Amino acid sequence: PILIFAFVMFAVMVNAKPSIDDAEMKREPKPNIINAPCSGCYYQVGNECVYDKLKCGPVRK
């Protein structure tokens, strides 16, 4: 009985961690919705738009 109890507790602990990660992953896209999606010569890195030199060449001033 002790081994069964330990196995159940282990399974619960292992299953609890991915649910926390899933919650963080689901929470992450929200800032992208607040900020307009990057368009044209920009691509998204985290919550920032970065200029794509390869696609559009040097930055125009």
From Swiss-Prot:
Disulfide pairings: C38-C49, C41-C56
Superkingdom of source: Eukaryota
Compartments (UniProt record): Secreted; Nematocyst
Residue ranges the record assigns to the propeptide: 20-31
Zinc in keyword set: no
Keyword set includes Signal: yes
Key words of the record: Disulfide bond, Hydroxylation, Nematocyst, Secreted, Signal, Toxin
Signal sequence extent: 1-19
Note in the entry: A synonymy between H.magnifica and R.crispa is controversial.
Family as reported in the entry's similarity comment: Belongs to the Hau1a/HC18/HC19 family.
Its biological purpose: Toxin that is lethal to crab. Does not produce the typical symptoms associated with sodium channel toxins in crabs, suggesting that it likely does not act on sodium channels.
Record protein name field: U-stichotoxin-Hcr1b
Annotated source species: Radianthus crispa
Species lineage: Eukaryota, Metazoa, Cnidaria, Anthozoa, Hexacorallia
